[in-house]
Amino acid sequence: MFSSKENSLGAKRAPFSSNTTSSQRVAAQAAKRASSGAFAQLTSSQIQELKEAFALLDKDGDGNIGREDVKTMLTSLNQDASEDSINHMFESINPPINLAAFLTAMGSMLCRISPRNDLLEAFSTFDDTQSGKIPISTMRDALSSMGDRMDPQEVESILRSYTSHGVFYYEKFVDAIAGSKDSN
């Protein structure tokens, strides 16, 4: 029906010798899945943005980008463009990079960005004294008038557990939803 090196869809299988044990095959397949796991966690909008970035970096249109291209891109995205960061990216892939390898590498990098730090930074804009506390009136106003506005019942249910003496303890709130600073 089809050769032993093709699956039912006609795709080539990984070449294994007759001496390869089933545990070696499972380990090889697991390693392949793990490397694409970061890519699988990207949202469709992130994938689209990264495809556009890849196209911008691929100046000659050959479907590949090199180390300098990656450094330029990271710098333009305000990401870590140090030699260590770039070397880390290239530990598992060798330049030049095709689109699939680029998406996997960038997915891995984006997964390391801490949502905890992003949340703390957002809340700190309302914290004039950088004390980890925001006046409850400020939080009520922000949650009911900015972005995706919340109704008063939603605001109170969010603030209730993290409010004491008229202040919202946003660091405790962030710890609850994004993990404590000790877990990062």
Curated annotation (Swiss-Prot):
Residues 45-80, 114-149 form the EF-hand domain. Keywords: Calcium, Cytoplasm, Metal-binding, Motor protein, Myosin, Phosphoprotein, Repeat. Coiled coil: none annotated. One of its GO terms (molecular function) is calcium ion binding. Signal peptide: none annotated. The modification Phosphoserine is found at residue 36. Residues 1-29 are annotated as: Disordered. PANTHER family: MYOSIN REGULATORY LIGHT CHAIN 2 (PTHR23049). Binds to myosin II chains myo2 and myo3. This is Myosin regulatory light chain 1. The gene is rlc1.
